Regions:
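Conserved tyrosine-mediated DNA breakage-rejoining catalytic core shared by Y-recombinases
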Residues: 166, 171, 175-210
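Active-site/catalytic core of tyrosine-dependent DNA strand-transfer enzymes
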Residues: 204-261
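N-terminal core-binding DNA-recognition domain of tyrosine recombinases/integrases
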Residues: 8-11, 25-43, 47-131
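DNA breakage-rejoining catalytic core of tyrosine-based enzymes
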Residues: 125-143, 195-206, 220-224
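Catalytic-site neighborhood detector that most strongly recognizes the C-terminal catalytic loop/helix
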Residues: 195, 301-327
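A short, glycine-centered helix-capping/turn motif at helix boundaries
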Residues: 108, 162-175, 280-284, 290-291, ...
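Basic, Lys/Arg- and aromatic-enriched nucleic-acid-binding interface segment
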Residues: 138-170
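Short, basic (Lys/Arg/His-rich) helix/loop patches that form interaction surfaces
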Residues: 245-299
Length: 328
């Protein structure tokens, strides 16, 4: 969650963080790199551990981490919860801490200082009940898209378009490159999905329209990624969390323009895209005058089975029963 990260982390604070703690983090990240961990995974560990060390800076007198005990890490867990982070988010931050201290325990240099991984003694939070899926109608999606265009937020309009066109996961859409979209093709560069599966994402008219607007606005730069942010006047690749924050901010558009409250997230667009293609309400389906079959959607979503694809759609059992008895 980039909003939480950006609220806690600043370069000024980071400059003040204990050098021992910084060195431990960098050595741990180098170890992850040597294990061939993905760049995105390593970046996530870095962000998670920066939150930890800024907490230590502000709440624990910037002590070197080897001087902390179990109660300190328990208090850290409580502090994270006070920031209204989800159980999954808190558990991930604690997991990053445990992994780093586990590395330190076994390391020749740090093992003398850190003989016991006290963080391992702090229990994780109980997993929260799965959230309800919030489906979006094509009309609601177009309201979001048109509002972003009107605000000249063309990059976010492109994200909205690509999510609904491709039914891609956030991690897949994040991998799309700047030069991978053109009128001559309908597929992006190759991305890596769940379980290491490689494929290209499909896009259509909405993506092409938003892409042209965005690239004209963005101009020339040497960043390969499709997604960028500007920090202190400097362009850089947007973080993975930025895409999440942008999508969450669109909830306000539906509230302001349609008086609709929906707690949707990036994955809602994957569900909604498949549902709209299945019912024929997606603009692509209307253009083709067809409803996509479950088998076609399985291929579209890069699922292993139609059972998985079916689970992404709205359950229509009640409608089928009413229709069977002539009550619909």
């Amino acid at each position: 969650m980039s909003k939480v990260y950006n609220r806690i982390f600043t370069e000024k604070k980071w400059q003040e963080v204990n050098k021992y703690n910084k060195n431990l983090m960098e050595d741990f990240l180098l170890e992850l790199k040597s294990q061939k961990k993905k760049k995105g995974t390593i970046d996530q560990y870095r962000n998670d551990l920066r939150i930890l060390f800024i907490y230590i800076l502000e709440e624990l007198d910037n002590k070197p981490i080897h001087k902390l005990k179990k109660r300190n890490f328990r208090d850290y867990s409580l502090w994270l919860q006070d920031k209204n982070m989800s159980s999954a988010r808190v558990n991930r931050l604690l997991s990053a801490l445990r992994s780093m201290l586990s590395f330190a325990e076994d390391d020749d240099e740090y093992g003398e200082d850190i003989e016991i991984n006290y963080a391992a003694k702090v229990k994780g939070l109980t997993k929260e009940k799965a959230r309800d899926i919030h489906f979006l109608t094509m009309s609601e999606i177009m309201t979001i898209y048109n509002s972003l265009k009107a605000q000249k937020k063309y990059q976010q309009a492109l994200l909205c378009a690509l999510l609904i066109d491709s039914a891609g996961r956030r991690q897949e859409v994040y991998q799309v490159l700047k030069n991978a979209i053109s009128k001559e093709a309908n597929f992006t560069n190759e991305v890596i999905g769940k379980r290491g599966k490689k494929f290209r994402l499909f896009y259509n008219d909405l993506t092409l329209e938003a892409y042209d607007l965005y690239m004209a606005q963005r101009g020339e730069d040497d960043i390969d990624s499709l997604w960028i942010t500007k920090h202190d006047g400097e362009l850089k690749q947007a973080s993975y969390e930025s895409l999440y924050a942008w999508v969450i901010s669109w909830r306000k558009i539906l509230k302001d323009e349609l008086n609709i409250d929906k707690e949707f997230n990036p994955h809602s667009f994957r569900h909604s895209s498949l549902e709209l293609l299945n019912t024929g309400e997606h603009y692509i389906a209307k253009k083709l005058n067809k409803k996509f079959s479950l088998q076609e959607l399985k291929v579209y979503a890069h699922h292993e089975s139609t059972d998985t694809t079916s689970s992404y759609l709205i359950n229509k059992d009640d409608e089928l029963l009413l229709e069977a008895f002539g009550l619909s």
